[in-house]
Swiss-Prot record:
Cofactor remark from the record: May bind 1 zinc ion per subunit.
Subunit comment: Monomer and homodimer. Part of the essential Sec protein translocation apparatus which comprises SecA, SecYEG and auxiliary proteins SecDF-YajC and YidC.
Gene3D superfamilies reported in the protein's UniProt record: 3.10.450.50, Helical scaffold and wing domains of SecA (1.10.3060.10), P-loop containing nucleotide triphosphate hydrolases (3.40.50.300), SecA, preprotein cross-linking domain (3.90.1440.10)
Protein known as: Protein translocase subunit SecA
Reactions catalysed, as given in the entry: ATP + H2O + cellular proteinSide 1 = ADP + phosphate + cellular proteinSide 2
Native source organism of the sequence: Methylobacterium nodulans (strain LMG 21967 / CNCM I-2342 / ORS 2060)
GO CC, alphabetical: cell envelope Sec protein transport complex; cytosol; plasma membrane
Molecular-function GO term, any one: protein-exporting ATPase activity
Annotated Pfam families: P-loop_SecA, SEC-C, SecA_DEAD, SecA_PP_bind, SecA_SW
Gene field: secA
GO biological process, one term: protein transport by the Sec complex
Chain residues that bind Zn(2+): C939, C941, C950, H951
Protein task: Part of the Sec protein translocase complex. Interacts with the SecYEG preprotein conducting channel. Has a central role in coupling the hydrolysis of ATP to the transfer of proteins into and across the cell membrane, serving both as a receptor for the preprotein-SecB complex and as an ATP-driven molecular motor driving the stepwise translocation of polypeptide chains across the membrane.
Length: 958
């Protein structure tokens, strides 16, 4: 009560913050006459003048007013659009690293140009982030005209570009692209082997459009670059065939938490079925050697119980394609991890793609926190303000609309069954269509949008292709004549190619559009129709000239007439029905269910009432809807029955809206907690990721990594000595045999450690120093034989590829640890602290393994120098096999072996050892094929002796 009174007197904190921007808005407005007086050349020259001011010590804040005034004037000249005062405020919020909440149609795309231009003047690059390739291209081409006019360059990052094109786009002053492309480029950059191959040039400032969709809805979804592993398709198919044989009591399903697990009886039943099918051959299901089968069973169970076709995914062209639960868009190329996608493919009887191993991954939460400054725009952020502040340190500012919102948001109508609800929706669509009022019907899934489409067809409506010019002309003719067409369009993941047409024309008189969640659609619904879309569609083949201009004028005039019809298409007052006042015209939003998030509902509502237009929104619900069913519909159903609610009757009351809003708040709070928890765990990996990626970058930046290689070699010596000669131990307690074996295995050295150990008074420190010296001399000899320049290249490749190999294994290990760490809670131990502790130990192990792997490879590698001009030589390559596992550890790319030397060039083919001790590409019977052989390497003849004790001895004697 007191808070409400104080707010009336003093205004909200948001009002006060907005008021704080007004003086600078006035200053920008004061510069407008001066800017209008400048010629195009003089206005363009403002960019260089502002850059000079920055170079002379001024800050971006110091030049904000003239920079914004410059952009406003450029937009007027190039686009014919002038930034409103509230848009200037939005630009200031973005520049300060905040989130500007702006209603639909308030010009977010134009607002971004202000902060983008100002920050681009610093020369560090600005990334503008959109949710799909279409919007990235559209905004870059549209707003790029302003930047080009002012002398700045614009690049676009979309799917399908090669590295050279990406690098050029990132080198521009301003880069537009999708969140996925930015994230994947970052991961790919950190898998490159030369700095010059990296495409991104840093993370200075990013403006994220639809920021709530990217940083909230997709926060839990990691970006993953993966590689294929063994084919297990037979196992997926075999286990999938058993799922229909499970009874409902065999598993516990929690739709609220989206979890499923086998019951005790279910475990016994599935074990019996697995034995019958021959999948479980020995032991019990939960024996250690059967853990893979358990994993596949769990994923198959999830696929059958938690994932629904045409809601969570669709099947298209023999593929399972994920559907974004928040936007309804298809996400081709995205795959569920941990074998879940393969389980879905087995369920749907499509080709099972190989399972993948994670090579690199990052969440959007951690990627966007790389930026020194981050800002965002959306129409709906205030409901998630706490999360933006806590996780990203982003404050939300609600920007006032340029004109008051005239949309009427009605109370929900709640029916007992879905059948009654859909009957009411069809009746409401009929009434609106008869008045020529355009209707946008929002659904939660493809399945429901197609169900509603089928119901409309049963009631005499026909589907319409909005991208078909002749079909649309029929709609426009009906609008001119005042006829109803009884046509509708469906916008979901199946018809995403027509998205721009469908959304742009959804404001035509009498239009009926069924759409899955409207988050991130990015195209405004303009009452009467969209001029640009109609010109593109109808005049594509008409050249510039008087006829084209006349047609454009006619289209504009018709759209204005249609707009007038839509504005007057509201429902008149009906005193008999208890409605004393009429309901407005404009776009009518009908929601067929409430989403888990209030924000998604608000996004749907926000499609109507843009820029002061009238509009109307209403949600039709049933107790069978997901949200109502999961959150206590049984109690409400009993209450409605007691109230004597007849079939087809609805209950309408503000209390119902409040109860639903509370249920949504519960879900939002739960999802926030889940995202926070995910972030806590991911932060552990993120800290390690930053260390590894930074170390990689340092290695690539160095001309030589010899110093690092030497330190690693010394570290291996120290570890070996410490392992076999305990501190303060007596000589008779030393494990000299083990020490010798480790020296030969890890350092490829043959030294008389037994003799050293027998010397009077010798200490472990002396042995350590002798081993270091012997290892240094052996490596120096190898460098001399192979050539310092070439060895420097090989050292860097071995170091980078060994680090990558171990990092990939580390990611898998951390992932497995994360899956099981929750069980520590049963023992009253904090799983997060346990995870941090064990992840730290694993990371230390990675560092130790890197030392050993790099040292072991470099102490064995031999590089055969060959003349490059020899025509019979095969393509040059380098490879080295791990001396223990025989795995191929690194490859030098073809053609990368040219090194200037004495006016010529060298080719190389580095050869390593296989596990039997034979040198690859060498004929044991022909010594002329052996090339140079290291003294401590196995003799190529196959005797099993070291070269120095076999043919090397004969060569020395000779």
């Amino acid at each position: 009560m007191l808070g409400a009174i104080a707010k009336k007197i003093f205004g909200s904190s948001n009002d006060r913050r907005v008021k704080g921007y007004r003086p600078r808005v006035a200053a920008i407005n004061a510069l407008e006459p001066e800017m209008e007086a400048l010629s195009d050349e003089a206005l363009r020259a403002r960019t260089d003048a502002l850059k000079a001011e920055l170079a002379n010590g001024k800050s971006l804040d110091d030049i904000l007013v003239p920079a914004f005034a410059t952009v406003r004037e450029a937009a007027k000249r190039v686009l014919g659009q002038r930034h409103f005062d509230v848009q200037l405020i939005g630009g200031m919020v973005l520049h300060e690293g905040g989130i500007a909440e702006m209603k639909t149609g308030e010009g977010k795309t134009l607002v971004a140009t202000l902060a983008t231009y100002l920050n681009a003047l610093a020369g560090n690059g600005v990334h503008v982030v959109t949710v799909n390739d279409y919007l990235a291209r559209r905004d870059a081409e549209w707003m790029g005209r302003i930047y080009d006019f002012l002398g700045l360059t614009t690049g676009i990052i979309v799917h399908g570009l090669d590295d050279a094109e990406r690098k050029a786009a990132y080198a521009c002053d301003i880069t537009y692209g999708t969140n996925n492309e930015y994230g994947f480029d970052y991961l790919r950059d950190n898998m490159k082997y030369e700095l010059g191959q990296m495409v991104q040039r840093g993370h200075a400032f990013a403006i994220v459009d639809e920021v709530d969709s990217i940083l909230i809805d997709e926060a839990r979804t990691p970006l993953i670059i993966s590689g294929p592993i063994d084919d297990r398709s037979d196992l997926y198919v075999a286990i999938d065939a058993l799922m229909p044989r499970l009874a409902r009591e065999d598993y516990d399903l929690d739709e609220k938490q989206r979890t499923v697990s086998l019951t005790e009886s279910g475990n016994e039943h599935i074990e019996e079925l697995l034995r019958e099918a021959g999948v479980l051959k020995e032991g019990d299901l939960y024996d250690a050697h059967n853990i893979t089968i358990v994993h596949h069973v769990n994923q198959a169970l999830r696929a059958h119980t938690l994932f629904t076709r045409d809601k969570d995914y669709i099947v298209r062209n023999d593929e399972v394609v994920i559907i974004d639960e928040f936007t309804g868009r298809m996400m081709p190329g995205r795959r569920y991890s941990e074998g879940l996608h393969q389980a879905l493919e087995a369920k749907e009887r499509v080709t099972i793609q190989p399972e993948n191993q994670t090579l690199a991954s990052i969440t959007f939460q951690n990627y966007f926190r790389l930026y020194k400054k981050l800002a965002g725009m959306t129409g709906t952020a205030s409901t998630e303000a706490d999360e933006f502040q806590e996780i990203y340190n982003l404050g939300v500012v609600e920007i006032p609309t340029n004109r008051p919102v005239e949309r009427v948001d009605e109370d929900d109508e709640v029916y007992r069954t879905a059948e009654e609800k859909y009957a009411a929706i069809i009746a409401e669509i009929d009434k609106a269509h008869a008045r020529h009022q355009p209707v946008l019907v929002g659904t939660g899934s493809i399945e429901r949008s197609e169900h509603l489409a089928a119901l409309l067809e049963r009631h005499g409506y026909k589907p319409l292709d909005y991208s078909n010019a002749s079909a649309m002309e029929e709609v426009y003719a009906a609008a001119r004549d005042g006829r109803v067409t009884k046509k509708f369009a469906v916008l979901n993941a199946r018809f995403h190619e027509q998205e721009a047409y469908i959304v742009a024309q959804a404001g035509v008189p009498g239009a009926i559009t069924i759409a899955t969640n409207m988050a991130g659609r990015g195209t405004d619904i303009k009452l009467g129709g969209n001029v640009e879309m109609r010109v593109t569609q109808e005049l594509a083949g008409l050249p510039e000239g008087p006829e084209r201009e006349a047609r454009i004028v006619a289209i504009k005039q018709e759209i204005e007439e249609n707009r007038a019809k839509v504005l007057t298409s509201g429902e008149p007052a009906d005193p008999a029905a208890g409605r004393k006042t009429g309901l407005p015209g404009g776009l009518y939003i009908i929601g067929t269910e409430r989403n888990e998030s209030r924000r998604i509902d608000n996004q749907l509502r926000g499609r109507s009432g843009r820029q002061g237009d009238p509009g109307r929104s209403k949600f039709y619900l049933s107790l069978q809807d997901d949200l109502m069913r999961i959150f206590g519909s049984d109690r409400m159903d009993g209450m409605l029955q007691k109230l004597g609610l007849e079939q087809g009757e609805a209950i309408i009351h503000p209390w119902i809206n409040k109860a639903i809003a509370k249920a949504q708040q519960k879900v939002e709070a739960r999802n926030f907690d889940m995202r926070k928890n995910v972030l806590k765990y991911d932060n552990v990996m993120n800290d390690q990721r930053k260390v590894v990626f930074e170390q990689r970058r340092e290695f690539m930046a160095q001309e030589s990594v010899r110093e690092t290689v030497d330190e690693m070699r010394h570290g291996v010596v120290d570890d070996v000595v410490a392992q076999h000669i305990p501190e303060d131990a007596y000589p008779e307690q030393w494990d000299i045999a083990g020490l010798r074996a480790s020296i030969e295995n890890q350092l490829n050295l043959d030294v008389p450690v037994e003799d050293w150990a027998k010397e009077e008074g010798i200490a472990d420190e002396e042995i350590r120093e002798r081993l270091r010296k012997a290892a240094d001399e052996a490596y120096a000899d190898r460098v001399t034989r192979n050539g310092p320049e070439l060895m420097a290249y090989v050292e860097k490749q071995v170091l980078l590829q060994s680090l990558d190999h171990l990092w990939r294994e580390h990611l898998v290990t951390l992932d497995h640890l994360r899956q099981v760490i929750g069980w520590r809670g049963i023992a009253q131990r904090d799983p997060l602290n346990e995870y941090k502790s064990e992840a730290f130990e694993l990371f230390n192990g990675l560092i130790g393994s890197l030392r050993e792997q790099v040292t072991g490879q470099l102490m064995r590698i031999e590089i055969m120098m060959q003349e490059p001009e020899a025509p019979s030589l095969p393509p040059m390559f380098a490879q080295h096999l791990d001396p223990v596992t025989g795995e191929n550890e690194f490859f030098l790319p073809e053609g990368s072996g040219s090194f200037g030397a004495a006016g010529g060039a060298y080719g190389y083919a580095a050869q390593g050892l296989n596990t039997e001790g034979a040198v690859l590409e060498r004929d044991p019977a022909d010594a002329s094929t052996w090339g140079r052989v290291g003294r401590n390497e196995p003799c190529p003849c196959g005797s099993g002796k070291k070269y120095k004790h076999c043919h090397g001895r004969y060569a020395a004697e000779a």
